[in-house]
Amino acid sequence: MYFKPNFEQFLPKKEDYEKAKKALDYIIPILEKTPHIYDVFVGGSYAKGTWLGRDIDIFVRFPKKYKGQNISIYIEQTLKEHNVPYIKLHGSRDYFQTFYEGLKIEIVPILKLDSPLEREFVTDISQFHVEWVKKNIKGLENDAKYFKIFNKLINTYGAESYLGGLSGYACEILTIHYKGFTNLLKGILKWKPKVFIDIEKHYSNIKEAINELGKDKTASPLILIDPVDKTRNVAASLSYKNFALIIANSYLYLNNNILYKINKSDFETMLEITFRVEETKEDIKNAKISRLTRKIVNYLEKNGIEVYAYTIDFDKNKSYLWVCCEKITIKTKHLGPPAWVNLDKFLEKHNKFFIREDGRLYTIINKTFSVYDIKKVYPEIESIKFLNNNPT
C-alpha cells in the first residue's frame, strides 16, 4: 500500500511536553526516596531530545558496589510505600511500569558506572547511550525523530526479534552518522549487505569487527557498532526483509514523497488466523506468534498452497495471509513396502506401481490439502477463516 506520509502529525505537541514535565515532577521526588541509590536519571529519547511522546524512561542508579544484588526490591518498596500503582516486569533485573494521565513511565534499576565495560547487564550502558547521543546530536534532533517516524510508518521500527527492525538508538546513530534525515535516506540508497558503520572507529575494518563479535552478532545486513560498546552490533536484529523495505522506501520518499508498507488491505484473498496464546509477557507472546506464522507459511507452501504475502497484528494475536487457494489437489508419491514384504496387500490397492533403487514400491496418488488442515498440525490456532473473496 502506497501512502503520502505526514511526519508532523506524529511529533509531540506542546501539551505532550507539559504532561511529561508534570509526570516527572510527580514521580522523581518519590523515586529519590529509594534507599541506597546514587541518583535518579531521566534517560531514553526524552533525555536525548528525540522523544516522540509515547513513554519516558527513568533510570534509578545505584552505586556499583551493589553489583550482583537485587536492587529492584528497593524501588518496589518505595513505590508501595507511596501508593504508586505499578506493573512489575521481568528482565535481567525486574523493572516497573506506571502511568501518569495515560503517559507510560518505565522505571529501570541500573548501576552508576564510570565505564560501559563495568556493566553487569546491557541496561547498565543505557546511561552512556544518553550521554553519547546528547553530545553528538545537537541540531539533528528533529531529523532523528523523522527517521524514527519513517520506520514506524513502514513497520520497520523496533529491535525485538519478532519485529526485526531498527531501535530508536540505531535511528539516532544513523542520523548522526549521515548528518541529517535527507542525507541518511540518500546514504541508504547505496546500501548493500553488509553495510559496516563504526562511527567511533573501534575497528579498522569490517573483517576485524566480524572476527571480534562473531558470526551470530554480525549476521544482519547492517553492522552498526555501538559507539560506547565495541562488543555490540546495534542493528543485530535487523532482518533482510526490513533492510530491503527501508532501502525501497528511501527511494520512494526521495523521488515521489511517498512510502510503502505491506498491508492486509492489499490482499485479494485474506485468510485470518487467530492464535490461542497463554503467555502474558508481550515480547514472548509476540515472538511465539511470529515463529508460528512463519512455520504455517512454510507448511502451506510445502503442501502446494502458495502464500503471496502475510502480515501480523500482534495486538489481536492474528495473522493475515494472502493465499492462492483454499485447497489444492496434487499428485504425490505414496511409498509402499519392499517387494518382499506384504506385496499382495499393496497390489490389491494400487494397480500401477514403480520401484525405487532400494527395492521399495511406490505409486502416484492424488492428494488434497486444505488450508484448514493446518489446525490439526498447530494446536495453538484458535480459528481460521477467510475475510474476503474465498478462493477456490
Curated annotation (Swiss-Prot):
Q: Name one GO molecular function term.
A: magnesium ion binding
Q: Which SUPFAM superfamilies match?
A: Nucleotidyltransferase, PAP/Archaeal CCA-adding enzyme, C-terminal domain, PAP/OAS1 substrate-binding domain
Binding-site positions, ATP: S45, K48, H129, K148, Y157
Q: Which cofactor does it need?
A: Mg(2+)
Sorted alphabetically, which keywords does the UniProt record give? ATP-binding, Magnesium, Metal-binding, Nucleotide-binding, Nucleotidyltransferase, RNA repair, RNA-binding, Transferase, tRNA processing
Determine the domain of life of the protein's source. Answer: Archaea
Enzyme Commission identifier(s)? 2.7.7.72
Name the reaction it catalyses: a tRNA precursor + 2 CTP + ATP = a tRNA with a 3' CCA end + 3 diphosphate; a tRNA with a 3' CCA end + 2 CTP + ATP = a tRNA with a 3' CCACCA end + 3 diphosphate
> What is the top EC class of this enzyme, as a single word?
transferase
Per the UniProt entry, what is one GO biological process? RNA repair
Name the positions where Mg(2+) binds. Answer: D55, D57, E106
Kindly give the NCBIfam families that the UniProt entry links to this protein: cca_archaeal
Summarize the subunit comment.
Homodimer.
Extra information: A single active site specifically recognizes both ATP and CTP and is responsible for their addition.
Explain the purpose of this protein.
Catalyzes the addition and repair of the essential 3'-terminal CCA sequence in tRNAs without using a nucleic acid template. Adds these three nucleotides in the order of C, C, and A to the tRNA nucleotide-73, using CTP and ATP as substrates and producing inorganic pyrophosphate. tRNA 3'-terminal CCA addition is required both for tRNA processing and repair. Also involved in tRNA surveillance by mediating tandem CCA addition to generate a CCACCA at the 3' terminus of unstable tRNAs. While stable tRNAs receive only 3'-terminal CCA, unstable tRNAs are marked with CCACCA and rapidly degraded.
Q: What is this protein called?
A: CCA-adding enzyme
Q: Which organism is it from?
A: Nanoarchaeum equitans (strain Kin4-M)
This chain is encoded by the gene named cca
